[in-house]
Amino acid sequence: MDASPNKPEKIKLDFKDSKYATGRRKTSIAKIWLKKGSGKIYVNGKNYNDYFKRENHKMQLLRPFEIISQPTNYDVKCNVKGGGLTGQVGAMVHGISKALLMFDTELKSTLKKEKLTTRDSRSVERKKYGHRKARRSFQFSKR
């Protein structure tokens, strides 16, 4: 049987001599493999342009490479799960920054100034009982 025309073919990538790092943001977890290459970025087997539709997500994803002035020197393979697209981009940026430090430790001060190596610990606050939301109470009636 031939592959159905609706399903894209699975891309096989050779990342044997690559650096591995994980990034996290909100409930998203990104596993990053980074190697010297030509600037290809794959997210869950798709090109990042196909995976992320919004322009600000694409710009945010390329930010670590623009900061170190080497946007096309690395290939990235990423498996990301959990959360929404914004959280996934944040997790990927965190992971890419950590993987770049494995290639060159001198980049640490540059990436740290831009706060890319720091885990953003903000997440959704839980809903409390007796409240409508995490902090919003029910409407108060005096009488």
Model-derived regions, located:
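Intrinsically disordered, compositionally biased charged tails
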Residues: 1-17
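Structured, basic alpha/beta domains of bacterial-type, RNA-associated proteins
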Residues: 12-24, 30-72, 77-81, 86, ...
